[in-house]
């Protein structure tokens, strides 16, 4: 599998919006390191994008450090389809974010977009330390799990495969204390054809 890095060329792109730099993404073996840092007085973010679509299956993201990041940092591990005709961009998310509140302990989020419709997101307090999170995507069914927390969504509105790809990003909703980084390992475990 090959990762490419998002680069906005100094412009502001979503999410955020943020300035995205390719040098805020480093790949070594099966580990992707994402960074948020200040460059010439501007906060910049990093996003890695897998080179191909994988479709139904089990997506595993191993976070090599605590998910409790700076209050203004957001770590996203998700599927996204750039096709504007795709339903809600086929976005299926695992996120770690305090959303600006340093006292927020429910920093883990499992989401099937759009998040603001009832029953499409849960927030939880994750374990503090390295952990493996999974999204199992099957026809009409998605199951998320992370360090003993699990949640499932069933329905005809679960997206079918298209041209979605795995994205991993680290971005900011405001200034952070120094540079912030996250190390993630990704594995794909094969096609899932039914409900477990």
Regions found by a protein language model. Name each.
Residues 109-132:
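Short, aromatic/His-centered strand-loop micro-motif at the edge of beta-sheets
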Residues 34-105:
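Secretory/extracellular carbohydrate-interaction modules
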Residues 126-143, 147:
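Localized edge beta-strand/strand-to-loop motifs within extracellular or lumenal beta-rich domains
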Residues 48-58, 122-129, 159:
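Extracellular/lumenal carbohydrate-interaction signature centered on repeated Trp-anchored short motifs
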Residues 56-58, 84, 157-196:
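Ligand-recognition surfaces built from glycine- and aromatic
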Residues 2-31:
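Extracellular glycan-recognition surfaces and repeat-rich motifs
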């Amino acid at each position: 599998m090959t990762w490419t890095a998002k680069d906005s060329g100094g412009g502001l792109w979503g999410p955020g919006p943020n300035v995205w730099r390719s040098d805020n993404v480093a790949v070594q073996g099966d580990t992707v390191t994402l960074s948020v840092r200040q460059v010439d007085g501007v906060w910049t973010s990093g996003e890695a994008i897998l080179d191909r679509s994988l479709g139904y299956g089990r997506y595993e993201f191993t976070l090599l450090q605590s998910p409790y990041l700076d209050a203004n940092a957001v770590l996203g591990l998700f599927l996204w389809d750039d096709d504007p005709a795709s339903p809600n961009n086929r976005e299926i998310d695992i996120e770690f974010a305090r959303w600006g509140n340093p006292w927020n302990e429910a920093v883990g989020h499992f989401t099937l977009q759009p998040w603001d419709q009832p029953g499409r997101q849960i927030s939880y307090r994750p374990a503090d330390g390295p952990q493996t999170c999974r999204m199992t995507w099957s026809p009409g069914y998605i199951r998320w799990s992370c360090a003993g927390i699990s949640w499932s969504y069933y329905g005809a509105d679960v997206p079918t495969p298209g041209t979605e790809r795995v994205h991993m990003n680290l971005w900011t909703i405001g200034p952070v204390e120094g540079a912030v980084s996250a190390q993630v390992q990704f594995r794909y475990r094969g096609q899932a054809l039914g409900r477990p």
